Amino acid sequence: MNTGKVDVLLGLQWGDEGKGKVVDVLTPKYDVIARFQGGPNAGHTLEFEGEKYVLRSIPSGIFQGGKVNIIGNGVVLAPDLFMGEAKDLEKSGHDLKSRLLISKKAHLIMPTHRVLDAAIEAAKGKN
């Protein structure tokens, strides 16, 4: 049986503490970069070869050749945001098809979820 080392980067704030940028710095040292939970709410801006990218769903290891990137079971994907992000990366020459794996159990945010969420927040009022 092969055993390997696994490092996990966790955020213990509200999710906006800069994990994405830290992961981007660390990705050259790892073979697999995986998101295991979270959604597309914050995003992180990265610069790669002089171009700026905003990643909200796709792991930043996508910029490193030969790395496997995984979107895991606990990730919440918004298909419209994900597809926009993927198209922007592919237009810039980044190969997602051979380096990005998405769990069949990843959750989806559908337009109805956003409408319902907005209605619930509106019903709460300002307090």
Model-predicted segments: where are they?
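Non-transmembrane, aqueous-exposed alpha-helical and coiled segments at domain scale
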Residues: M1-N127
